[in-house]
Structure formats: C-alpha cells, structure tokens
Amino acid sequence: LNVPWYGASITCTVHCGWVHGRLCFFIEPHSQDAFFHRGCYYGCDDDPMRFAFFSKAALEFLLRSNKRPDVIHCHDWQTGLIPVMLFEIYKYGGMEYQRVLYSIHNFKHQGFGGTEILQATGLNRPEYYFQYDRLRDNFNPFSINFMKGGINYANHVNTVSPNHAWE
C-alpha cells in the first residue's frame, strides 16, 4: 500500500489476521520517521503527525482494497481527521456513502497541529480548514483541532460515558 504523504508516498505493509473471530487489518508504515516503531503509543512530540498519517493510511487502504464499510467508527482525537478526509477528499474517489460514528473518550486530549498536517494529508486549503465550523481550534486560531474536526464532520457523535456526554 502506497500512502500519499507530502506530495510523495510512504509504503506500508498491510497484515491481516483474525482477532476474536473478526478479520482485522493492521497497517505497518515503512518510513524514515518510524511512526509506530518507538516502544510507546502516545506521548511523542509528533503524535499529531503520526496519527494524521495513520488516518490517511486507513482511508487509502479502504479505497485501494475496494472495501466500503457502511460505517466507519472513529475513536478519540487520534482518528479525528478520518471524517474530515473522508468527506473532503475520499468521497470524490468513490467513498461517498460511508457514514462516520465518532466516539469521544477523553476531552482533555484533543490533538492539535498546524498547516504542515494539512499539507501532508492533502487537505491543501488551509484558509478553508482554519474556519470556526471546521478545524480551527477555539482557543488558538493558528492551530487545527483533530477532535473538533471529528465532531464537525462525523454523521453521529457519542461518548463513552454519561459524564463525558454532559461535559
């Protein structure tokens, strides 16, 4: 799988296997950035870029493999750009009927980034995405907010607990 990234591409290997009776696909990028070969899942300075890449790779996999799920279920800020890219890029490539459920696990961590993330993913119009009703963070107008993008672009949003729903 070749994933478009910054005007070039990053090659990934897609592994598949059964987990609890369900066929699952795992995407392994082969990049000099070693996005996910670090010994930790979170807490790296480039987490927004790493998870933006993962989101792009997941959509590229669905597109290239002709898999068209009815619902794409995204979890927390790490996948907040999936609904954005789905409705701004991938619907024009044949993925126009998928619906997105976005689940919020923790409002404390929302995922922030700048124009470099938009450029890397192919969301090439910063002036369009840095709008209040799209990705612009409410407190830092020079930053995009992944969670806000997930909320604004998803068809449905839910939380993992009643307390989060109240917040």
Predicted regions and their residues:
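Catalytic cores of nucleotide-sugar-dependent glycosyltransferases that transfer UDP/GDP/TDP-activated
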Residues: 1-167
